[in-house]
Amino acid sequence: MTAMLILGVDPGLNRCGWGLVLSEGSRLSHVAHGVITPSAQQQLASRLHDVFEGICAVIEEHKPDEAAVEETFVNSNARAALILGQARGVALAAAARRGLQVAEYAPTTIKKAVVGSG
């Protein structure tokens, strides 16, 4: 049975959540988690840079085998969806920079997996 360390990212510009789980067969165990919180006083480019650097630091420290990033949820606020998409883009770029394979999941799929309904 091969163990695999997986980094999950819930992208956001105000708060970007991340978590690491170790997958061993059908068993998952928590390894670490955290939140990257760029200053709201910074300009957009600086905040995106903080998210990118934060995810790169997590990858450097924990050396995950793969990553999973939540897809953007599009609602009636197009501007918010575009900004979230940019945060998601830097999360994908950080994983790609480290050569990680990235799986992408819809928010409803993640919610169903975690709480049983979506």
Language-model segments: residues:
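Phosphate- and other anionic-substrate recognition elements at nucleic-acid/protein interfaces
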Residues: M1-G118
